[in-house]
């Protein structure tokens, strides 16, 4: 899958800003699994919170034509993401950091920030398939399953 994106960097974290359709959110983004939140009570609190808040978000999506959300922050690991920069100039200005992020389909993607919105989007899509082509901004960041990588994703 080729994703048009803008590449950015803050500190030592590289991220990609892009848009996903609601259908892509449904198909590609999975719930946070146990390897990130190892504490059972924390996982239970997150799940309870997801159930309550995602229902409100689902209704907001279904009821409002003027709906809007801020960007989802999604962690990507496994697979072999590849970045291809597209260089272009406009009026003597160059624009690096614009390009295509390629995902081969073996990547695992989960929400770091936006779990409620992800689940609300999925639930709304089940009720109204016409929402499939709506888009939401996403920030994609790399995730490592190392101890340090998991700590970073929890922050």
Task: Name the predicted role of every residue range.
Residues 46, 68-74, 78-79, 86-155:
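Basic- and aromatic-enriched surface patches that contact anionic nucleotides/nucleic acids
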């Amino acid at each position: 899958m080729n994703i048009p994106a803008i590449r950015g960097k803050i500190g030592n974290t590289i991220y990609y800003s892009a848009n996903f359709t609601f259908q892509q959110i449904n198909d590609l983004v999975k719930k946070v699994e146990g390897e990130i939140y190892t504490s059972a009570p924390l996982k239970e609190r997150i799940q309870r919170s997801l159930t309550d808040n995602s229902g409100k978000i689902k209704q907001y999506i279904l009821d409002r034509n003027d709906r809007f959300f801020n960007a989802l922050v999604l962690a990507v690991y496994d697979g072999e993401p590849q970045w291809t920069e597209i260089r272009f100039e406009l009026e003597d200005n160059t624009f690096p950091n614009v390009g295509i992020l390629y995902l081969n389909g073996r990547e695992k993607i989960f929400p770091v920030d936006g779990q409620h919105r992800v689940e609300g989007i999925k639930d709304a899509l089940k009720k109204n398939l016409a929402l499939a082509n709506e888009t939401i901004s996403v920030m994609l960041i790399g995730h490592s399953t190392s101890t340090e990588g998991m700590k970073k994703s929890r922050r």
